[in-house]
Amino acid sequence: MTYKSDAIKLACSLISKGKIDQAGSVIDGEYPFVPLIKGKRSYTPREMTKVFISDGFIDRYRGTKLIYPPALRLLSIYLPKQFPYHKNGKMSEAHIGYWELFPTIDHLVPIARGGKDEESNWVCCSMLTNSIKSNWTLEELQWELKPKGDFHEWNGLIHWFIQQVHSDEKQLENSYIKRWHKTALDCAGDIRRFTDIGVSY
């Protein structure tokens, strides 16, 4: 196996000897240029919720517990000073929990690296981890994919969110809360598969 740094070293050595064509062949063969293709799309709350539930609200790259997005938003509504929210994600004005604990969908194999935009290539991770991973592969980052979480042990507070909105229905006046609440109910079938025993909140 030729390390990428070794390929560069060899190419530089060949250049010093005036062997430009050979240097080019080394790069073409050992460390070729592959243009990154930008590929980004928005996912519906339902698509995201299904992935979050399937992965057990666990960051599949770090193994940390994550929180159902509207549960964090609801927390900010009740505790605006202690857990501030910013609609544009301004880090100087929003709680760090919106990056550390907020789940999103990531492409296991980045679209820019030839990955497919399909469920088999989707995993749950935090906004923070998603930002770090960017268009890199797990091999390049020397990361490993963590096992899915156990929904019986951790449900991302999705049950708390549903129950709290049911007990405080005025929160449905907030369009974000209303949209995600409907999504949670629409995904009841996915949730029910994991609720045959007690679930911690």
Segments the model singles out, each with a brief description of its role:
Residues M1-K50, G56, G63-P69, V199-Y201:
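A boundary/linker detector
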Residues K87-T104, P110, H152-Y176:
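Short Fe-S-cluster ligation motifs
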Residues G56-D59, Y98-D106, P110-S131:
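Short beta-strand-alpha-helix junction that forms the catalytic/metal-binding core
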Residues L141-E144:
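Domain-level detector of nuclease and nuclease-like folds
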Residues P45-F102, S126:
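Short cysteine-rich loop/turn motifs with clustered Cys
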Residues Q163-Y201:
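Short flanking/linker segments adjacent to small metal-binding domains or redox-active Cys/His motifs
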Residues P69-L72, S134-L138:
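Short Cys/His-rich "knuckle" micro-motifs
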Residues L66, T129-K133, G149:
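A generic secondary-structure signal for well-formed alpha-helical elements
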